[in-house]
Amino acid sequence: MNKLTINACPLCGGAHLKRAMTCTDFYASGEQFDLYTCEDCGFIFTQGVPVEAEIGRYYETPDYISHSDTKKGAMNAIYHHVRQYMLGRKARLVMKESHRKTGRILDIGTGTGYFAHTMQNKGWEVEAVEKSGQARNFAREHFGLNVRPEAALKELVPGTFDVITLWHVMEHLEHLDETWELLRELLTEKGVLIVAVPNCSSYDAMKYGKYWAAYDVPRHLWHFTPATIQQFGSKHGFILAARHPMPFDAFYVSMLTEKHKGSAYSLSLIHI
């Protein structure tokens, strides 16, 4: 398997990289991956992840709910209830930050299409992109959405979107600088980019350490703080307009983390 080796910090270009911790893939493989930090700017990333063309199998599990939409188990049931509330909250956030009740929106990494469907129902013209064929099929069958594969991003007309959203997507994308540049090109002159990412400087991340579910190796390649996500935006011509917490996302991640800690304890007992 071909793996991505990072020798220079994607944010500042620095070469002073240090291993920070080792995390486990609790979803698909049980494999371990190292997290590295840039000693110059503090940016954190996962080292040695499979390259983009080969990472697909790490998403192919029913436990990866944003692609499978499974409702089995208490954790997934909670996810579905929380999502219903968050869909409305996200829609209100889009309209507040864009100062628009309708417009043209691009949802990148749309998953099974719930958010794109919500915005469509509110009168927005929606384009949606998703790398998972399984998730694209679900969105088409359940919502009638024409969800394009990820490669279609480069086929979209520049300067035509009032809003672009990436809900927990940026941390998955291998070509980070290229993505930021493309986002800037696709937006209208006064367009708004909304990016939601886990905060690896949060209380929960500090508390749980290597068990924190939002490290989600190897699917999460990049691990942002409020400072580093803002620095990436500034690097590519974006100005930070607002910052919003997503407490229900954090709550769900903490529940997954507790489950992971239980799994690790059980595995250690079996090993003994």
Region annotations inferred by a language model:
Residues 1-73:
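N-terminal juxtadomain amphipathic helix
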Residues 3-7, 17, 85-209, 221-236, ...:
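Conserved SAM-binding loop
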Residues 24-29, 241-267:
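Conserved catalytic loop of SAM-dependent methyltransferase domains
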Residues 34-35, 63, 141-145, 163, ...:
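Short low-complexity, flexible loop/linker segments enriched in glycine and/or proline
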Residues 39, 66-71, 147-152, 163-173, ...:
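Short, structured secondary-structure boundary patches
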Residues 72-75, 208-217, 256-263:
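Short glycine/proline- and charge-enriched loop/turn segments
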Residues 74-90:
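Conserved SAM-binding loop and adjacent beta-strand
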Residues 270-272:
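Conserved small/polar residues in nucleotide/adenosyl-binding loops
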